[in-house]
Amino acid sequence: VLTGLDNRLKNAPPEDWARITILVNTQRMARRLRELFDLGPPRFLPKIQMLTDLDNFLPDGPSPPSMSGLKRRLELVSLITKLIESQPDIAAQSSCFDLADSLANLIDEMQGEAVTPEDIARLDITDQSGHWARTQQFISIAQKYISAAKSAPDPTARQRENVLKLQAHWIKNPPPHPILLVGSTGSRGTTQLLMQNIATLPQGAVILPGFDFSMPRQVWNQMMGTFTGEDHPQ
């Protein structure tokens, strides 16, 4: 990343470095980039921030703070406890916290991929009807939680809301300065959406990790199918 910026900015005014924003997906990468910049030569530094920290891009200011993980866990425990009390055969009372953690992970995945409880309820699982009926009862808890948490969304839901706001804003008002998203593979739906948005900006770029620049075009073309490319390292 640093080498590429050096090559592109070698004849640019020094203040152009300060106009660049670099979004990274881990604190470790942010620290490493800062360490490399600290090695010199002296220059203005770009802004380096986490891709989950998008508040400074939002046109209307920061979104409301997200719900804490502990509060979410306790709310899910409360909902699961009520379900178990009404149907004691569904699970042991001692499993409430484990079930809450599993349900929290499911909710994160649903919100990150924009999957609603209604989408899951419509799945046709005819060969596992008994197990599926129990699963749907827990899905109903997720539905209650998501509906009740709209005023104070958890971090995953808040991030998706921010990305959707930026998508709408950037269509009409693209940022006047370069934005680079570095090091993410887009394995999460919300991050992938952010990457797509940045890649379409006039001064946006997405830098993928481990990209094979020597791979022939025909191999890339073979990976276009949903199933033919899913196991390929690229």
List PLM regions with ranges:
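Conserved P-loop NTPase "ATPase switch" module shared by AAA+ and STAND
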Residues: 175-187
